[in-house]
């Protein structure tokens, strides 16, 4: 009978290794603690793979808990070993987290198992394919003992994202954009839109824009406490990550805003918002260009603009 090949050791979240992945940092652990989650950190070691991992847990009721791993673990095995590795890791973690754990959800930051061309599934513009969920589940379970890995109904944080390479010059970055995008960035400047770095005192202004955006785009808004937790956590973990709060103004009017985080060499567009008024001022374009320039001055190599729908699908939570 095969035995578990993965060893895990609990550790303090403050001692998580430096990483470019915001959601695997001491800062993010503190954010989630303030929002009511429990956090757990572990070192892990398997055959040829070691690292650490931040896990979030929450009570679901009736003595049942769920665990969530956002963009982790960072270090993983060869793609053919994804399933057995996750099975072993999960079984080892349950012994420490508790047997009342209903499931562990992983949003994996690893390379897709479906890179390259093929005939199975849908062919995407970048040449990669992703079969239907049932076939993805079958592939992930190859080599596992229990066949207990399930494909989540929706990919959340990493399956499809827009990531910009910041190693290019500003001229090269602008040159790689669609003509309409370049035009709107410059139009915002000509119309007098100014982007400034702000502070927590103007967070209520941003939240008002955020509520307008959620109503306009029909998504569920996070509570105000979510945003204030970012700043409270930053004060507790000043050396872990950075938070930058950008507002686009035209005169006295605030037209758009963004919260940008920096972890390691990666900047992440965490939240954005824009006014339902004066949309012809193109303030969101000015915000994104300011965020790109800020990330470059901070030495970042990539700018993660966040998750997007994998294809035009009005039902997908990241469409639009």
Feature map (PLM): residue ranges:
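A conserved beta-strand-loop-helix scaffold within acyl/acetyltransferase catalytic domains
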Residues: 2-63, 111-113, 118, 130-133, ...
């Amino acid at each position: 009978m095969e035995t578990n090949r993965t060893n895990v050791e609990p550790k303090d979240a403050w001692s998580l290794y430096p990483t470019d992945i915001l959601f695997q940092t001491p800062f993010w652990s503190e954010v989630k603690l303030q929002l009511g989650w429990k956090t757990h950190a572990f070192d892990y070691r398997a055959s040829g793979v070691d690292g650490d991992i931040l896990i979030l847990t929450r009570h679901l009721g009736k003595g049942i808990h769920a665990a969530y791993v956002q963009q982790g673990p960072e270090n993983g095995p060869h793609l053919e070993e994804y399933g057995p590795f996750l099975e072993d890791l999960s079984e080892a973690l349950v012994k420490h987290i508790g047997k009342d754990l209903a499931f562990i959800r992983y949003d994996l930051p690893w390379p897709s198992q479906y890179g390259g061309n093929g005939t199975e599934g849908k062919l995407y513009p970048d040449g990669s394919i992703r079969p239907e969920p049932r076939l993805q589940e079958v592939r992930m379970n190859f080599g596992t003992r229990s066949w207990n890995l399930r494909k989540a109904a929706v990919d959340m944080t990493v399956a499809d994202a827009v990531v910009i390479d910041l190693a290019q010059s500003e001229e090269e970055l602008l040159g790689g954009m669609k003509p309409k995008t370049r035009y709107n960035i410059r139009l915002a400047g000509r119309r007098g839109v100014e982007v400034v770095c702000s502070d927590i005192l103007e967070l209520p202004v941003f939240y008002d824009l955020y509520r307008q955006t959620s109503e306009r785009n029909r998504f569920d808004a996070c509570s105000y406490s979510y945003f204030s937790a970012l700043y409270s956590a930053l004060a507790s973990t000043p050396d872990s990550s950075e938070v930058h709060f950008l507002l686009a103004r035209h005169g006295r009017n605030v037209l758009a805003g963004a919260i940008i985080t920096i972890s390691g060499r990666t900047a992440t567009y965490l939240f954005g918002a824009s006014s339902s008024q004066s949309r012809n001022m193109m303030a969101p374009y000015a915000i994104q260009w300011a965020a790109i320039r800020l990330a470059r001055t901070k030495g970042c190599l990539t700018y993660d603009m966040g998750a997007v729908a994998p294809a035009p699908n009005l039902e997908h939570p990241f469409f639009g």
